[in-house]
Amino acid sequence: MSTTSMQDLLRTLRNRSSIHQDGLEIVDKSIPDVSTPGTLDPRVREVVLTQRPSVSIPEGASPVELARAGMGWDNEDMTTRQISTDVLSIPRPDTTIEARLYRPEAARPLPLVVYFHGGGFFGGTLETVENPCKALADKGNVAVLSVGYRLAPEYPFPTGLEDCHASIDWAVEHADRLGIDPGAIAVAGDSAGGNLATVCCLLDRERPTPYIRYQVLYYPVVNVGEHPNSEYDWTLEAYDRQTEPELLERIILSLQDEEGVLEQWYVQASDSKDPRISPLFATLDDLPEALVITGEFDYLRLEGEAYAKKLARAGVKTRYLQYRGMEHAFLDKLGLYPQAEDSLDEIAKDLKRLFSQTN
């Protein structure tokens, strides 16, 4: 897509409508070049029907290796200035985990966003989210620490969560070295990473003075195991499928089988209704301001909506963005889907407001 075409689509996306409902700001982001309801974004349609990610599958690969190999996408670097990358090691009991720190050339100390990649708790890589993290550092004028937490099934719950939570402590303790402001900490994540981000907020709430001031949850997993609950009932009829209903149904249901995998690989001997696994069942009072982002045709959309509403009812300042025509994991396609870049622009606006930046 040409730069001009992308900029035109981004300008259209910025003209969005919003309503306030029961304390929740709901922002509806229509497809920028399609007006028909219940329609897949044309860029998503092209990817689904004609493109496949290039993957290398080792001979004799296990089910876990096969699942991991199919994740991610070759996205684009959308930065407009130099963003430095430092590869770091965060100490953990008996090991270290890799992290990457992205920083713009700007006056320090900088606010910090700690980012947790998606991948069902068993997959995903720092490489997949590198360009989104760099773009966020550029647009928000912040440092971004992307954390390579340990993955299931080799490391089931709570290892990955503990790695994520410890990475926040480590960043605060090493604020001077990292060039960050320990009083301006945010967390963000996509899918399983959104789960880890908001659960870190739950854990952070127990401190006398919490560190985290803002959370960004891209299409978060908040009800592992799809337990019956009072917040929402999952039904295919909640999705407007006016055009190409069979294709839309296939896209929506593409994650349906993953719930059993999460129980088997991530939860294992734990209880999937534990609020640290399924934060939909947590008490959400006194959590930091939240931005929840979903795609219209994402299997996880309904639980993301429900979580945003529950946050707002608990008194948490919450904004909910729904991108019409989008599939799950659309942030991975930064540079191809204008909605991915627009969502980062929305986050950047919040970061500048919260941390009093004027640039």
List PLM regions with ranges.
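Alpha/beta-hydrolase superfamily serine-hydrolase fold, recognizing
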Residues: 2-19, 35-36, 84-100, 104-359
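N-terminal targeting or regulatory segments adjacent to alpha/beta-hydrolase or S9 domains
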Residues: 1-79, 359
